[in-house]
């Protein structure tokens, strides 16, 4: 007996959608500034839980996400052996951090997500920024959870969007231009920034042309005042561990002399 064409239509539609996802994912991977294997290796070597150094926070496993210059997700990975080795919610946060750093950086000026904290706080000059690009939340839980963090992660090829204004997102630069961005999440935001800094350096995509920190890059700036404002306007609060110490050691952060007593 022949199957009615009408009955086949939903199946054919589903196959077409799956095929389009595969094509999008393949195209995104081809245009990615990093390869999945490179990103995974760099992440594992930058996180204590997977054999790397401490970053001053909880030393949890981490997620890392890279977007292309147009904001499409092209790589998602993790430092643990399975998705539940990391905070599951941090997969989306990492993607949103990457989106933010890419969207707000330029060829000549980098802004890390850490640089946005003070400005986006109530009363700040960027207050309301987090509402400007809501994430496509239906994408976060789509696909097979067992593939999260793999080369075939369902987020690859998608534009999730989202804006995050705390540490962990960095723009990626080759020797000529901005080529995308990296987001890391799974620990304190201060530790996430340190991990992202290490990963970007390991990938060779840290040719930052300029930025708002005193070191003229996108380093995290620990200059929050007692009234919770930032001396520079681009500051980020400390997170309670030794993250600021680590940041200074790896040149990922700037702490004014008056604030250094606060991390002793």
What are the language-model segments listed below?
Residues 1-13:
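Bacterial N-terminal signal peptides that target proteins for export
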Residues 1-3, 17, 167:
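Accessible peptide chain termini
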Residues 10-22:
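Bacterial N-terminal signal peptides
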Residues 23-29:
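Sec/Tat signal peptide C-region and signal peptidase I cleavage site
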Residues 30-264:
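Flexible, solvent-exposed loop/hinge segments and secondary-structure transition points
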């Amino acid at each position: 007996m022949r199957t009615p064409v009408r009955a086949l239509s939903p199946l054919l539609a589903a196959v077409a959608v799956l095929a389009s996802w595969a094509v999008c994912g393949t195209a995104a991977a081809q245009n990615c500034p990093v390869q999945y294997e490179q990103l995974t290796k760099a992440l594992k070597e930058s996180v204590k839980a997977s054999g790397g150094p401490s970053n001053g926070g909880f030393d949890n496993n981490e997620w890392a996400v890279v977007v292309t210059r147009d904001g499409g997700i092209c790589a998602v990975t993790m430092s643990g052996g399975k998705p539940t080795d990391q905070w599951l919610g941090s997969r989306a946060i990492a993607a949103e951090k990457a989106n933010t750093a890419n969207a707000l950086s330029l060829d000549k000026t980098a802004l890390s997500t850490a640089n946005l904290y003070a400005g986006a706080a109530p009363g700040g000059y960027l207050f309301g920024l987090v509402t400007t690009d809501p994430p496509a939340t239906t994408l976060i839980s789509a696909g097979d959870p067992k593939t999260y963090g793999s080369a075939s992660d369902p987020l690859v090829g998608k534009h999730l969007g989202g804006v995050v204004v705390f540490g962990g997102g960095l723009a990626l630069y080759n020797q000529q231009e901005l080529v995308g961005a990296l987001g890391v999440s799974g620990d304190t935001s201060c530790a996430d920034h340190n991990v992202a800094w290490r990963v970007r350096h390991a990938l060779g995509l840290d040719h930052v042309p300029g930025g708002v920190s005193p070191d003229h890059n996108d380093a995290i700036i620990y200059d929050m005042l007692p009234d919770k404002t930032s001396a520079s306007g681009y500051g980020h609060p400390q997170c309670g561990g030794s993250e600021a110490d680590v940041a200074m050691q790896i040149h990922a952060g700037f702490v004014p002399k008056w604030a250094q007593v606060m991390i002793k």
